[in-house]
Amino acid sequence: ELTDSSDPLQVAKAIRSAFGYSTFYVADLDAILSGPVHSDVISSLVKDGFDVLLDAGTGDADQVDGLSESVKLNDLAGVIIGLESVPKPEYLSLIKQRFSDLPMAFSLDLMNGVPITHGDLWQGYSPTSILDIALEAGMDSIILLDLASVGMGTGNRCLEHCDYVKMRAPDVNVITGGGVRSREDLYELEAHGCDGALVASALHDGRLS
């Protein structure tokens, strides 16, 4: 194991020391579940030189504005807008219009290929139709994540969606994760147009070094 610490900053430092990585996807689960934002943790990561992509459960423009009261948004590498936090499709364009200068990533959250949605207004939308809405809204990056693959080491399940985004919008940054277990998996993601990969378990247990 890289570290026996559960402190986020110490974990991040251990990963940076071992692999040289300084960009982190940070999911603040308390904030996602409508609790407080761990602004002290975010600030400590930024202060130590880490680039933070933050998912704090922001699903509309007012929530992004509220996040700015806890975190300096301009200090972040980007704010993540997760599908499971967005109640209405039209909110994606409204968020991006209001915060046009803020780097923003839309995360297509799936479970076994099925979109994880917030409320009934997303019913009937396929993964590709949701991606179309995010791209038309002007999202800077797209994150593709099938939660059924996370931590399982069974390979990535989002390759067809990576292909789709790159076909529709070649200049949009595409990041995917879940199930990455080897360098070969990373090469495969690159072949499907991915610009980045979310990796955790394979770093912690030494499968990737």
Where are these regions (language model features)?
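Conserved N-terminal beta1-alpha1 strand-loop-helix module at the mouth
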Residues: 1-49, 62, 74-76, 103-106, ...
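Surface-exposed amphipathic alpha-helices with a cationic face
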Residues: 16, 42-47, 68-71, 92-100, ...
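A cross-domain feature marking catalytic cores of carbohydrate-active enzymes
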Residues: 28, 54-58, 83-85, 106-110, ...
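Acidic-and-aromatic substrate-binding clefts and catalytic sites of carbohydrate-active enzymes
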Residues: 32-36, 87, 205
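Catalytic cores of alpha/beta
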Residues: 51-75, 160-196
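A structural signal for isolated positions on well-ordered beta-strands in alpha/beta enzyme cores
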Residues: 53, 80, 105, 141-143, ...
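Hydrophobic, well-structured mid-protein blocks that either form specific transmembrane helices
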Residues: 64-114
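C-terminal helical cap(s) of enzyme catalytic domains, especially alpha/beta-barrels
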Residues: 92-98, 186-209
